Amino acid sequence: MINYIFKRLEYKNYSQMISLIEERHQDEMTYFSWMKELNQIQIDQLTNTIKSMFSDHSWVGVGAFDEELLIGYIMGKCELLERKSIVKVTFEGISLKHDVSSEVLRQIYQHVSMLWIEQGCLKHEVYIPLGDNRYLKALQGLSFFEEQAYAINDLSKPLTFDKLHQVNVRIANEKDQKLIESMSDIIFSYQNQSPVYVPAYPEMVKKIREGYRNIVFDKEVTILIAEIDSKPAGFHLYESLQPTWHIPKDTCELTVAATYKHMMGQGIGRSLMIEGYLLMKTKDYRFIHTDWRIANLASSTFWPTCGFVPYMKRMVRIIDQDILWANFSHKDNQR
């Protein structure tokens, strides 16, 4: 392997970072039909995003250089989230030249992770593209695990199942305020239970409940409620999604999808999906975007059957906090 130079990224590197992302995007277009050539507006948007990283000192990144040529990089933002100091490497924060080994990403991480840990950031989140297996291979080889999948459903492709007649699906209205608030705990309760085990911090639960309390009054949101024998069984929540360099225009977000556990297995999710699919098409959307926890057994098996194709995953590694003192710099480990 070439002896690359690894050094901290600087503002002067931004144009080479953008070139690597554009190259990565070209490769991904081979796998995802909804991905198109980047237009100038998207390139400008991407340029502004990369430039802004260097105006914020919480972003820390390292690049691999072949002399002066940047051939790969990882750049993450150190922040406090959910009571922990974490590093978040966004979709723009990682890229590798197409003819370079995935091993280089592992070496870049070796260098950049030391800088993150120096700042006390022990949870590392990296959003990787799935159109190129090198990213997944590299992070799995660094003890990262898959936490969240992000997917697109192309509405030009037909659904492969039918709605069940016993399920009635309707659009929520302002009279459903208390009902929606009462159903707000469904999805988080799934996340909190086995085998997902996401902590339900009281302040987070309170924030979610307050958010749902008035969501029926939001004209930008569409809520579908499923009922069986006039009893609420589940709901889907849709809203518009702003296009980005990697999200196509005319895309809506399926933000929340939930079914009462005791009513699962009766076709509720499928019926909601069919009605949402048809309704979003009448609103001139061409794609639906959603995401799910990999460890959520119901979500991770159901959404792919609805036509959702993952294009990005959030990979996570959590470093044992004892490393901050249990190391060979500690006085008790000195000879």
What annotation goes with each model-predicted range?
Residues Y4-Y31, N168-Q191:
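A short beta-loop-alpha structural element at the N-terminal edge
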Residues M1-S15, L155-K175, L324-R335:
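Conserved N-terminal entry element of GNAT/NAT acetyltransferase domains
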Residues H165-K249:
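Flexible, substrate/cofactor-facing loop regions flanked by secondary structure
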Residues Q26-N48, Q191-G211:
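Conserved GNAT-fold acetyl-CoA-binding loop/helix
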Residues M1, S95-H165, M312-D320:
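Acyl-donor-binding surface of acyltransferase catalytic domains
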Residues M29-Q107, I228, A233-A257:
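Conserved donor-binding loop and adjoining core beta-sheet/short helix segment
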Residues G141-T160, I274, L278, K283-R335:
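Active-site/acyl-donor-binding loops of N-acyltransferases
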Residues V100-M114, V256-T259, G265-L278, T282, ...:
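Conserved acetyl-CoA-binding loop-helix of GNAT-fold acetyltransferases
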